[in-house]
């Protein structure tokens, strides 16, 4: 069951920007649906400190720092079945705040 519009509006009022992430299994048999708040400075700082020593743990913590829906127990079970999903979801959260932004350098 997905959150209703009232719950989404409450999260927006509390956290500001709220994002929906969806994905499907390769065969299309299952759809994954998440709601996240935008990662803040504290979550990014924690991520930056952890990523050099344990990238998977850093991604995992970034996801759980920002997760609004579904509940954490459900996502933990999912990540136990598919541990790499924490990296995929965490990468999407990084895009939201610009840590994966591509820049081009040109000598002048």
Segments (PLM) and residue ranges:
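Short acidic-hydrophobic surface loop/beta-edge motif
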Residues: 16-29
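Low-complexity intrinsically disordered segments
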Residues: 2-12
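Intrinsic disorder/low-complexity signal
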Residues: 5, 16-19, 64, 101
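Short, surface-exposed, charged amphipathic helix/loop patches that serve as local interaction elements
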Residues: 27-108
């Amino acid at each position: 069951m997905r959150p209703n519009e009232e719950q989404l509006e409450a999260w927006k009022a509390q956290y500001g920007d709220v994002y929906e992430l969806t994905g499907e299994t390769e065969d299309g048999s299952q759809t994954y649906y998440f709601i996240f708040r935008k990662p803040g400075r504290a979550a990014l700082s924690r991520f930056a400190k952890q990523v050099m020593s344990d990238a998977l743990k850093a991604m995992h913590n970034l996801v759980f720092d920002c997760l609004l829906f579904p509940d954490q127990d459900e996502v933990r079970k999912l990540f136990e079945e598919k541990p790499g999903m924490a990296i995929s979801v965490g990468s999407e959260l990084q895009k939201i705040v610009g840590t994966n932004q591509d820049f081009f350098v040109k000598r002048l």
